[in-house]
């Protein structure tokens, strides 16, 4: 920026030509009031030239004849108060061709020529009569034409201000002598409100070979007395607001300080950024800097008092229609380029904008916003900003009835900005404004995973609270909407993200308080999670960790504690493996005497006495019960060599004290304790007891057997039964030990992949138990014998399903074996890319395989027979993959032709079929086989 060194005289003017300021002077920089009060002249300096005296009354309004001249401060205040009505009065004066009572001055010919030049329309060769230089009823002497009605057309400042920025000494190659300026679009503003700033280092006048700009803007800065601009990129000029009369005001161009040219920053008034033009908000000189905004946005400056003229309704409507019809606002580069061009580049492209630069034009809302206070971020807001607005929370929506953008970075508009996992948000109510639901929901599908896109209903059920919900941590699942209110509104992006940034930060935190397979949480979490009265099982499946509350009651088992040789009954130092369990000598002798003496011990308390080194002799009933639960049997092999594998096998038989509330516990214990000494005692492992207790109740199909069977009615009844069984599977999985330790997406994926296997496996078990495999026992009210199978339209499918109960009859599967195999079916199919909680999944699956081995050992004696039994049962699980694949294919074909076949499919079942069955049939899942084919 050229330094203002002196104030020279007015440059000579050629009659009939445009005004010609000297090279190096600012465009409309107003000098001090001294040179304008007299006609004295001085030597002309080459660097700075003042504005011609003939333009003094034009560019800076003077009082008309008959009025006392006011001081500059009073005149400024009057000008500001007349901003609202100045535009209409000037237009009325121009339209009626009104005249002023002021007599023409001595240079009236020159003034008329300048006015004709200034008021000339944008087309060449057109002119119009000059309005009067001054009017008594208004402090504004000149206004330009209205804003154009057509949005693509150039603003009115193009034709009004171009002659002002021209020189008489222009080169022939220059076009109208316009200044070279780059377009800098403030963030959040449409192109129709863009400002023009000269780039740093570029010539300010048309004498240099620069590219003409189609929209030059009039710039005027009022400096304080005695202040000089030392640097072109220095601080912004500060001063009091002052009204600008003349063509600059008429053009409606926003004022830009000269210091902003180097930085490339265009500042606009606060209300201008929201298109709320009728209200003029002036920045006070000592206003504090707003948090989250750039210093340039809060620096006090002289806005040169450009009147904020109202936009044309046609222009605003066209811009609104353009924003609504554009297809590039989907979070990509188009959104970044349209709303936030970089400051340093004159050509706003798709370059991502820095986060700190975004809030310059996104001002925080007013304390009491009006209904029309935020039209920019209202109904015609692009979807990229809509997503951000939907996530702002209930507080923001309660303060303002209209949506607006809070100052800050918009992650939807800046895809390259690394974001951590967003905190989960509660489900939002449906939008109140028409058309908002479609705009908000459309781009949300891009961030939804394949498993979760169709699992909204499953997720609602998984999140459904039963009794007192577990304590929610920082990543606890948000509550879902009430059942029966339609689809689940829970946003999938409310879950912890698995993006690269989240992976770099570390492993994703658990969604739930981590539960072990024994129903107990890990250390540091509260324990009441499973249903009341369920048995607690032994802890080997969670690295042998127990809650803090039981740390003093019993030892904590881990590999570090193995060398201590701890007794698994009382926690004392173990002397060896006695009767099959690692125990101390005291517990060994106690168990032998109790079993051989046939003592009938009774607990004086509630069968939950603490058994440790100090209190192990207080209650012999609880001590003997703990010995039996640990797996101590008379005649067990003794070994004194502490091998890790053998110790782990011994630790697998450890059990915690059972809680109160299990029915017939005392009777069962008394029966066990009165066995003869030579009889072998076989105790069911506690985890299998837990699986028995959480087994779902009987489910009815609701089929009307009084009417003759038709294909559509039979298939519809089977679908209704499948919907109820799917709900039962979800509830059962929530109670399954270890399942809720997995990621919520993994839980939904496993249920969606295995629901058909679980249903047909349960069908085989019911058919085997109730009708000995002679019929298909779907439900108590829907049993198909062979005759009804032949009459149905899916007889071949019934024959396929009939193979399962026949295998059960052949193998004589026990209930314990069935329950363990059922859990393994839930864990038998995973995605090709694996699960998010793959490590926890593998540990859980290995644990239930060990439980199956224990269930086999309850009936089979000997290693050979147990191994053969394990092979037969696992081979049956492998063969189920091919059988279920046929069911998947038939189910998908029926679902596609459901209208033609008049078959009804319930909502949740339809979601799973439409989303997952094509993926399963296409081989996009990985079956986990026990044996190679």
From Swiss-Prot:
Residues 1-164 are annotated as: AF3. GO terms for molecular function: nuclear steroid receptor activity; sequence-specific DNA binding; steroid binding; zinc ion binding. Keywords: Cytoplasm, DNA-binding, Isopeptide bond, Lipid-binding, Lipoprotein, Metal-binding, Nucleus, Palmitate, Phosphoprotein, Receptor, Steroid-binding, Transcription, Transcription regulation, Ubl conjugation, Zinc, Zinc-finger. Phosphorylated on multiple serine sites. Several of these sites are hormone-dependent. Phosphorylation on Ser-294 is highly hormone-dependent and modulates ubiquitination and sumoylation on Lys-388. Phosphorylation on Ser-345 also requires induction by hormone. Basal phosphorylation on Ser-81, Ser-162, Ser-190 and Ser-400 is increased in response to progesterone and can be phosphorylated in vitro by the CDK2-A1 complex. Increased levels of phosphorylation on Ser-400 also in the presence of EGF, heregulin, IGF, PMA and FBS. The modification Phosphoserine is found at residues 20, 81, 130, 162, 190, 213, 294, 345, 400. A zinc finger (NR C4-type) spans 567-587, 603-627. InterPro entries: NHR-like_dom_sf, Nucl_hrmn_rcpt_lig-bd, Nuclear_hormone_rcpt_NR3, Nuclear_hrmn_rcpt, Progest_rcpt, Znf_hrmn_rcpt, Znf_NHR/GATA. The steroid hormones and their receptors are involved in the regulation of eukaryotic gene expression and affect cellular proliferation and differentiation in target tissues. Transcriptional activator of several progesteron-dependent promoters in a variety of cell types. Involved in activation of SRC-dependent MAPK signaling on hormone stimulation. This is Progesterone receptor. It comes from Papio anubis (Olive baboon). The lineage of its organism: Eukaryota, Metazoa, Chordata, Craniata, Vertebrata. The gene is PGR.
């Amino acid at each position: 920026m050229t330094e203002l060194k002196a104030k020279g005289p007015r440059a000579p003017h050629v009659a009939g030509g445009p005004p010609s300021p000297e090279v190096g002077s600012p465009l409309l920089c107003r000098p001090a009031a001294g040179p304008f009060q007299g006609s004295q002249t001085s030597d002309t300096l080459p660097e700075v030239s003042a504005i011609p005296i003939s333009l003094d009354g034009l560019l800076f309004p003077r009082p008309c004849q008959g009025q006392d001249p006011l001081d500059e401060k009073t005149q400024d205040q009057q000008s500001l108060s007349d901003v609202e009505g100045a535009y209409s009065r000037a237009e009325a004066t121009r339209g009626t061709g009104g005249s002023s009572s002021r007599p023409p001055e001595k240079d009236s010919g020159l003034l008329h020529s300048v006015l004709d030049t200034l008021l000339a329309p944008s087309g060449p060769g057109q002119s119009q009569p000059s309005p009067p230089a001054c009017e008594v009823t208004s402090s504004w002497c000149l206004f330009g034409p209205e804003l154009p009605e057509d949005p693509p057309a150039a603003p009115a400042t193009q034709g009004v201000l171009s002659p002002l920025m021209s020189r008489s000494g222009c080169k022939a190659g220059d076009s109208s002598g316009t200044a070279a300026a780059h377009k800098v679009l403030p963030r959040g503003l449409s192109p129709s409100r863009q400002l023009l700033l000269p780039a740093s280092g570029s010539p300010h006048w048309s004498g240099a070979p620069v590219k003409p700009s189609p929209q030059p803007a009039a710039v005027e800065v009022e400096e304080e007395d005695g202040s000089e601009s030392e640097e072109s990129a220095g601080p912004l000029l500060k001063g009091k607001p002052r009204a600008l009369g003349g063509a600059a005001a008429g053009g409606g161009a926003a004022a830009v300080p000269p210091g902003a040219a180097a930085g490339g920053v265009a500042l606009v008034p606060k209300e201008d950024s929201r298109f709320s033009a009728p209200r003029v908000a002036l920045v006070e000189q000592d206003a504090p800097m707003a948090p989250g905004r750039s210093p340039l946005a809060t620096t006090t400056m002289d806005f040169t008092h450009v009147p904020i003229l109202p936009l044309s309704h046609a222009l605003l409507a066209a811009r609104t229609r353009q924003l609504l019809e554009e297809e590039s606002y989907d979070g990509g580069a188009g959104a970044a380029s349209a709303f936030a061009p970089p400051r340093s580049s004159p050509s706003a492209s798709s370059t991502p904008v820095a986060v700190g630069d975004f809030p310059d034009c996104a001002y925080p809302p007013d304390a009491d916003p009006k209904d029309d206070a935020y039209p920019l971020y209202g109904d015609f807001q692009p979807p990229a900003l809509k997503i951000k607005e939907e996530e702002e929370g209930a507080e923001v929506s309660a303060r303002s009835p209209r949506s607006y953008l809070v100052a800050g970075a918009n992650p939807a508009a800046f895809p390259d900005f690394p974001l951590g996992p967003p905190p989960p948000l509660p489900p939002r109510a449906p939008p109140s404004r028409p058309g908002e639901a479609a705009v908000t929901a459309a781009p949300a599908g891009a961030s939804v995973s394949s498993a979760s896109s169709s699992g909204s209903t499953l997720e609602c059920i998984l999140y459904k609270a039963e009794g007192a919900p577990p304590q929610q941590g920082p990543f606890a699942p948000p509550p879902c909407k009430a059942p029966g209110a339609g689809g689940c509104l829970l946003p999938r992006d409310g879950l912890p993200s698995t993006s690269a940034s989240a992976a770099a930060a570390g492993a994703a935190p658990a969604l739930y308080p981590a539960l072990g397979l024994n129903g107990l949480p890990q250390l540091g979490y509260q324990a009441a999670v499973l249903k009341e009265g369920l048995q607690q099982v032994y802890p080997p499946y969670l690295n042998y960790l127990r809650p803090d509350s039981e740390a003093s009651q019993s030892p904590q088992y881990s590999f570090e504690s193995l060398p201590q040789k701890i007794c698994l009954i009382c926690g004392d130092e173990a002397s060896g493996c006695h009767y099959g369990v690692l125990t101390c000598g005291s517990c060994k002798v106690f168990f032998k005497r109790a079993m051989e003496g046939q003592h009938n011990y009774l607990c004086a308390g509630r069968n939950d006495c603490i058994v440790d080194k100090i209190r192990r002799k207080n209650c012999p009933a609880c001590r003997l019960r703990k010995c039996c639960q640990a797996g101590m049997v008379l005649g067990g092999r003794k070994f004194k060599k502490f091998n890790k594998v053998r110790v782990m096998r011994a630790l697998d038989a450890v059990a915690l004290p059972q809680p109160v509330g299990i029915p017939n516990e005392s009777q069962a214990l008394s029966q066990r304790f009165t066995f003869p000494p030579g009889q072998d005692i076989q105790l069911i492992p506690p985890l299998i007891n837990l699986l028995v207790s959480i087994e779902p109740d009987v489910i009815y199909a609701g089929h009307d057997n009084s009417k003759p069977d038709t294909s559509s009615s039979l298939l519809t009844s089977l679908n209704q039964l499948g919907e109820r069984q799917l709900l039962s599977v979800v509830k059962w999985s929530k109670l399954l030990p270890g399942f809720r330790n997995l990621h919520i997406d993994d839980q939904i994926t496993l249920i969606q992949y295995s629901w058909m296997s679980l249903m047909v496996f349960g069908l085989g078990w019911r058919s085997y138990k109730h009708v000995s495999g002679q019929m298909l026992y779907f439900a108590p009210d829907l049993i198909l014998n062979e005759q009804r199978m032949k009459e149905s339209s899916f007889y071949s499918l019934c024959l396929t399903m009939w193979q399962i109960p026949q295998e059960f009859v052949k193998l004589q599967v026990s209930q314990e074996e069935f329950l363990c195999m059922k859990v393994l079916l839930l864990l038998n199919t995973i995605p090709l890319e694996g699960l998010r909680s793959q490590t926890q999944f593998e540990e859980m699956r290995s644990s239930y395989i060990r439980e199956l081995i224990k269930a086999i050992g309850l009936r089979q004696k000997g290693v050979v027979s147990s191994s053969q039994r394990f092979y037969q049962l696992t081979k049956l699980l492998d063969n189920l993959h091919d059988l279920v694949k046929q069911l998947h294919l038939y189910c998908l074909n029926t679902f596609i032709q459901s209208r033609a076949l008049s078959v009804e499919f319930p909502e949740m079942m339809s979601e799973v079929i439409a989303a997952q069955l094509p993926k399963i049939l296409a081989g996009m899942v990985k079956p986990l086989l026990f044996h190679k084919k």
